[in-house]
A protein has these predicted regions:
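Formylglycine-dependent sulfatase
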Residues: 8, 22-278
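Bacterial N-terminal signal peptides
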Residues: 8-19
Length: 278
């Protein structure tokens, strides 16, 4: 769940990378957008110049090869910020101002335009991978709003692990009505698969899963000789993130810096794939 300050991430890591070398036509560059979660601008070494005690060289690479923004506006919640980006509209217009929760009917509506729908009309393969937070119901899924493929979770992490809490209601009817869905895999042809819960253990590696899916999507788009529009959304560095053993202790500064380094590594994989395909 993002605060206004932390949503400055939207201005920094809402990164539009046009890989012109890999483009299939001069007017159709591949487009990769990367988002994190609960990341402030000062958590990125391009801004803090090492003052946080760790480096984010892959994110810094985007700043060095592109632009570094020093003025930004962030919405007050994850749902509002993501809705503003994907629709290009104020959340007051779409109604997506609050944090989306399991069991809620709040989400993208059929009449809400999305950038993915537009990119489809331009001949792009469209994929969204990672955290969505734009609605709980099937009708809200990205694959009903312009994306060819989606793989990811639907809420903030502390909503995902609620059923593991000892005081979570034991009534099956409550779980059915208000329990979180798992990690969803869906396609625009209507196929929807719940791949299992995003429990505390899976949180350690879910960004690995999401990144692998994104890399595969990039490969398939390249093989199909189609430009791609890819929106990648990690769960790092949400405040409730759990890290896998290999990521713990890499900075010696605690779980948040360790998670930032892991997050930067995932972005590096995506950038390397762009270079490879080019």
């Amino acid at each position: 769940m993002n605060t206004t300050a932390k949503c400055s991430l939207s201005a920094l890591v809402l990164l539009l990378l046009a890989n012109l070398q890999a483009a299939h036509a001069a007017d159709q560059p591949n487009i990769l957008i990367v988002w994190g979660d609960d990341i402030g601008y000062w958590n990125i070494s391009a801004f803090n110049h090492g003052m946080m005690g760790y480096q984010t060289p892959n994110i810094d690479r985007i700043a060095n090869e592109g632009a570094l923004f020093t003025d930004a506006y962030g919405e007050q919640s994850c749902t509002a910020g993501r809705a503003a980006f994907v629709t290009g509209q104020s959340p007051f217009r779409t109604g997506l101002t609050k944090v989306g929760m399991p069991g809620s009917d709040l989400g993208l509506k059929p009449e809400d335009p999305t950038i993915a729908e537009y990119m489809k009309t331009r001949g792009y393969m469209t994929g969204q991978f990672g955290k969505n937070h734009l609605g709980d119901l099937d009708e809200h899924l990205p694959t009903n709003h312009g994306f060819d493929e989606f793989f990811g979770n639907l809420y903030h992490l502390n909503a995902e692990d609620e059923p593991e809490h000892p005081d979570y209601p034991k009534d099956p009817a409550f779980r059915e009505r208000f329990g979180p869905r798992g990690v969803i895999s869906s396609t625009a042809d209507g196929q929807i698969e719940d791949t299992g819960p995003l429990n505390k253990k899976r949180m350690e590696t879910v960004d690995d899963e999401v990144t692998a899916r994104a890399l595969d999507f990039m490969e398939r788009a390249n093989d199909s000789e189609k430009p791609f529009f890819l929106w990648w959304n990690s769960t790092r560095r949400h405040v409730w993130t759990r890290l896998k053993a290999e990521s713990e202790g890499v900075t010696g500064l605690g779980i948040y810096p360790d998670g930032m380094v892991e997050h930067d590594g995932h972005i590096g994989q995506l950038l390397d794939k762009l270079d490879e395909l080019g």
